[in-house]
Each structure stands twice: as structure tokens, then as C-alpha cells.
């Protein structure tokens, strides 16, 4: 396969991983194969039950924060996606035992800049709005976890935020979700409100 086709095949897998785990650029770039973890509570995901992040955002003067991001059922399509990349695409780069998940055609680790470039190319190909950037995938991930009704603390931990207020800034829930929430709360406050009066 020509090198440009390998690059084109790698980019979608990498971009989808940003969304499926809500990672920052640096976190994704720093991933090694050893960072893919099993989750004993979700054995069906095999080695993709969780991702161990070693290069999380640090506070001033502190080392990078580490955390584990669990694969959630709503995003479990990433399991087959990563399996395909690791078994079919990555070996074609001839990287041997290089530890990085995301590798270049010259057997090095991909850069943050290359992630931006791949996202820009995908955005233009899909005719998406110009103002979108790669970090928007992280915002979408956090919003979707909220809409999937995960607890706030779980979402905060998945995102690697030190404060719940930071996570709240990332969340932009849909009107449909807000309507469902009001419907649920009204049902709790006024039992039988949604029953058909006969």
C-alpha cells in the first residue's frame, strides 16, 4: 500500500479515538500500546476496556496527571476500531516494537501538530464549519456522557478535570436532553402525571 494511503487510513482511527475517550492532544499523542488496559468489569472489551493516560494536563510546577479512562458502552465501537488499527494498519508502518500507538511512516511517534492537520483535512473533506477544531471532540464527548446520564463525578474523572465547574463549562446539552430531564423530574415530583386518565 502506498504511504499516502497508509496515512489516510491511520488518521480516521486516531481522530475517532480522541472522541471515544475525550482525550486532549498531548494525552493521545503520548499513548503507548501498554496503556491499553483490560477492565475486569467489562471483559468483552478485551484490552480496550480502559486507557491509562500518563500525560494528563498538569498544574503549574506539577508533573502530568495520570488517570484511567474507561470505555463506555455508548462508545464501544472504538474497541473494533482500535483492534483494526493495531492489527491491520499499524503493522504496515513497519514500526516493529515501537511502544507508541500512533506512529509515523518513519517509525516515530506522531506529533500534536499532525493530529491538528489530520482533523483539518477531515473537516474540509466533510465540509464542516470552519470554527470547529480537534478540541471540540472532547467537548462533544463530555456532553454526550452527560446526556447518557453518567454521574457528574464519573464524567469529571473521565475528563481529568480537577473541578466539577470545569467539566460544566464543557457541557452543552441538547434541548431534547433538557426536555427528557424535566419530564423525568416532573414524574418524580408528581407521580402519575404521565398516566393516561381513563
Q: What is the meaning of each model-derived region?
A:
Residues 1-25:
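Basic, Lys/Arg- and aromatic-enriched nucleic-acid-binding interface segment
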Residues 7-12, 112, 116, 138-139:
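Short, leucine-enriched amphipathic alpha-helices that occur as contiguous helical runs
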Residues 17-31, 148-150, 161:
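A short, glycine-centered helix-capping/turn motif at helix boundaries
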Residues 30-81:
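Conserved tyrosine-mediated DNA breakage-rejoining catalytic core shared by Y-recombinases
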Residues 59-83, 97-120:
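C-terminal catalytic core of Y-nucleophile DNA break-rejoin enzymes
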Residues 108, 116-157, 161-164:
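Short, basic (Lys/Arg/His-rich) helix/loop patches that form interaction surfaces
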Residues 159-185:
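Catalytic-site neighborhood detector that most strongly recognizes the C-terminal catalytic loop/helix
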Residues 185-198:
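C-terminal secondary-structure termini that scaffold catalytic or DNA-interacting sites
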Amino acid at each position: 500500500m502506498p504511504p499516502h494511503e497508509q496515512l489516510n487510513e491511520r488518521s480516521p482511527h486516531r481522530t475517532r479515538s480522541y472522541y471515544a475517550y475525550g482525550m486532549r492532544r498531548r494525552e493521545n499523542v503520548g499513548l503507548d500500546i501498554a496503556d491499553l488496559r483490560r477492565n475486569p468489569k467489562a471483559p468483552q472489551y478485551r484490552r480496550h476496556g480502559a486507557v491509562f493516560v500518563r500525560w494528563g494536563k498538569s498544574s503549574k510546577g506539577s508533573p502530568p496527571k495520570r488517570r484511567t479512562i474507561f470505555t463506555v458502552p455508548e462508545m464501544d465501537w472504538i474497541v473494533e476500531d482500535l483492534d483494526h488499527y493495531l492489527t491491520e494498519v499499524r503493522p504496515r508502518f513497519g514500526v516493529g516494537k515501537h511502544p507508541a500507538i500512533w506512529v509515523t511512516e518513519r517509525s516515530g511517534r506522531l506529533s500534536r501538530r499532525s493530529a491538528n492537520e489530520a482533523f483539518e483535512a477531515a473537516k474540509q473533506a466533510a465540509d464542516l464549519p470552519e470554527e470547529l477544531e480537534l478540541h471540540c471532540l472532547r467537548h462533544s464527548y463530555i456532553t454526550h456522557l452527560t446526556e447518557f446520564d453518567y454521574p457528574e463525578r464519573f464524567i469529571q474523572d473521565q475528563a481529568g478535570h480537577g473541578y466539577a465547574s470545569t467539566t460544566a463549562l464543557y457541557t452543552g446539552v441538547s434541548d431534547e436532553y433538557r426536555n427528557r430531564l424535566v419530564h423525568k423530574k416532573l414524574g418524580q415530583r408528581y407521580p402519575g402525571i404521565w398516566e393516561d386518565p381513563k
